[in-house]
């Protein structure tokens, strides 16, 4: 018991020490992507393991049907997100989160009548080679 207490006392200051050299300010890369309409991605990613984006899409925007070789999670900041799958279409409103599992066929679109604003987390981070486009859900 004394050894455990001694270990905790010695490790506690180390475990809670703040190393300010690890903090960083991230300036996003702005990407313009042309689907049926142009959308904007603000990419805050700092590694290939994890992507972090803001996505801004106009009214009427839609992607083609895709299968993503990464998990996509996010939250709707403004507008209505539509996720179209083979059997159904799900809609997500402001302050609702969503998860698109890896390798799921989906068409992502703005399902509302105002611009769509999302914050997205991708695991692993985005690479063009990890996105496959399809003509249909079959």
Residue ranges and their predicted role:
Residues 62-63, 82, 98, 102-108:
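Histidine-centered metal-chelating micro-motifs
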Residues 88-102:
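Short acidic-glycine-tyrosine-enriched beta hairpin
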Residues 70-81:
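Glycine- and acidic-residue-biased ligand/ion/polar-headgroup-sensing regions
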Residues 47, 102-128:
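Ligand-binding loop in jelly-roll beta-barrel domains
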Residues 16-51, 130-138:
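A short, N-terminal "cap"/entry segment at the start of jelly-roll beta-barrel domains
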Residues 4-13:
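Sec-dependent N-terminal signal peptides
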């Amino acid at each position: 018991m004394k050894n455990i207490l001694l270990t905790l006392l010695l490790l506690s200051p180390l475990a809670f020490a703040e190393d300010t050299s690890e903090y960083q300010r991230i300036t996003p890369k702005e990407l313009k992507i042309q689907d049926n309409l142009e959308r904007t991605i603000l990419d805050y990613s700092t590694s290939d393991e994890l992507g972090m984006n803001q996505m801004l899409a106009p009214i009427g925007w839609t992607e083609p049907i895709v299968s993503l070789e990464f998990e996509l999670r996010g939250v709707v900041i403004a507008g209505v997100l539509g996720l179209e799958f083979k059997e159904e279409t799900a809609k997500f409103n402001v302050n609702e989160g969503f998860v698109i599992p890896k390798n799921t066929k989906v068409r992502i679109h703005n399902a509302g009548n105002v611009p769509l604003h999302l914050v997205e987390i991708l695991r692993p981070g985005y690479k063009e080679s990890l996105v496959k486009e399809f003509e249909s859900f079959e």
